[in-house]
């Protein structure tokens, strides 16, 4: 039974990811006053499957000077980690109920850095290596902010278990008392997933295509699949942490439906931001984190630690 659940989860994620790619192309098309994909199937709905068929049936070319083992392992590792991160998410019942679910997600997501660094180094290309170094510096930097924001939220929920966040938000969303944290979290997830306006790793005018420059066919598709799976995951996590849905034991379907709708709306916002904002300069990207987000999150973390200590002597006001 657990194997069937796992396969169903993976299939659902992969289908959602395929249609997210199509939705992005449609949204970008409409914002640029054109139609987007509309040839394959009705309204272009079969475009993702046509793309997958094309990419996975092409010959995967490998640069003659590349380190073959790492070159092949990197894209597979990226997608494996992206799918692994879904296992502790309660929707409403998690596949694996971990007491340290949030810590697991934070730790496992940081492993994505290895797949990016390996792919850039193993390609033996200057463009790919510079793109990989940029991506690693950016990802590691913004993970600091994500960790501090998570700590602040955990001080309110009192547990690393993701299911505890559902109980914490039974009466009101954590978005309301901690909206500055939510705003910084959302911007940090944009940077963490290398999305516009933080897609410095793919600076076409400077780096051709970033760390995946030398990839083609199947391995190239795996990187894209990992990126879009991570986007959906980050928005699902944002929904769970700041826009918690009340779980009614008599209608678990309602929880799943509301959770999915909120995640889809946040994902649409990701795509809207991509079609609207230009790319940051690299120094602006780093200054935003180290000079703005880090001091702010540290101050808010100290606030969330000090308020419960300062008010611990006050009796319950019932």
Swiss-Prot record:
Annotated membrane topology: Multi-pass membrane protein
Pfam family, any one: NADHdh
Gene Ontology biological process terms from the UniProt entry: mitochondrial electron transport, NADH to ubiquinone; mitochondrial respiratory chain complex I assembly
EC number: 7.1.1.2
Protein location: Mitochondrion inner membrane
GO molecular function annotations of the record: NADH dehydrogenase (ubiquinone) activity
TM annotation in the entry: 2-22, 76-96, 100-120, 146-166, 171-191, 222-242, 253-273, 294-314
Alphabetically ordered keywords of this record: Electron transport, Membrane, Mitochondrion, Mitochondrion inner membrane, NAD, Respiratory chain, Translocase, Transmembrane, Transmembrane helix, Transport, Ubiquinone
Family in the record: Belongs to the complex I subunit 1 family.
Protein name: NADH-ubiquinone oxidoreductase chain 1
Organism, scientific name: Pongo abelii
Taxonomic path: Eukaryota, Metazoa, Chordata, Craniata, Vertebrata
Gene: MT-ND1
